[in-house]
Amino acid sequence: EIAQCLVGSEMCIRDSYKTIMKKEDLRIVYMGTPDFAVEALRQLVEGGYNVVGVITMPDKPAGRGHKIQYSPVKQYALEQNLPLLQPERLKDEAFVEALREWKADLQIVVAFRMLPEVVWNMPRLGTFNLHASLLPQYRGAAPINWAVINGDTETGITTFFLKHEIDTGEVIQQVHVPIADTDNVEVVHDKLMVLGGKLVLETVDAILNDTVKPIAQEDMAVVGELRPAPKIFKETCRIDWHSPVKRVYDFIRGLSPYPAAWSELVSPEGEAVVMKIFESEKIYEAHQLAVGTVVTDG
């Protein structure tokens, strides 16, 4: 079959090679930065997949002492003696050439940065991303937060092939995950992190076995309007006490424990103190107090 393909087209050569390739031979480059991205990398390494290189953010000073800290992905990569690149600019010629020398068949992106086409279009089998929502819902930087803030009872995890517009590529696989009424963003994050690692492996296996049937996001059925998941800033986290009880409750758990919902406690003298609120309870009862009044039990 291979000899016949060599006489034919390049596509035929690629398809035959893909059919006979084993996971140990598939050259994978992995890109990610936070804890969420470590789980999938760990499962790839422990599963015997051939991770030939890791790309993560440059080291940055953190904390009051401004000490240089490694990203969680870098820490794991060093522990496993994996080759590592930390580019400042993803279009830098030196970085692109170093990446090309790894000769990746497939690239995997989990919680990293928006990639230029020169990077995501490099591997012969493409580049896929793991996104913490049921795309096309919650495209953007903070999908887990916004799903909880909006009071959703279900979210999920998606793998999709990268294209030019962010989070819009063809969907490969999805897993649905329930959100309990008491879940905060940390609980949902951890659920998706573990399932995401498994989904990455399943996606790699599907690509290896040539069983992928990607679906364009515009062809997917969506209930209701598409909701975005923009980056969250400090002012985004300010509680609006004029909102309904459930809205405030969901808002607090959707930002807990990080970056945390906040409000100002104003003294009779007019002095304001910022306080972060990590947990709340819904209580429905009649009262005559003004909205925003602080009531204590002693």
Language model regions located:
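Internal anion-binding site segments
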Residues: 222-298
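N-terminal glycine-/serine-/threonine-rich beta1-alpha1-beta2 phosphate-ribose binding loop
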Residues: 61-105
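Donor/substrate-binding cores of folate-linked one-carbon enzymes
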Residues: 26, 47-50, 57, 106-228, ...
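Amphipathic, non-transmembrane alpha-helical secondary structure
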Residues: 38, 42-46, 96-100, 117, ...
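Short beta->alpha connector loops
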Residues: 33-36, 88-91, 111-114, 283
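Single conserved hydrophobic/aromatic residue that forms the stacking wall/gate
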Residues: 1-15
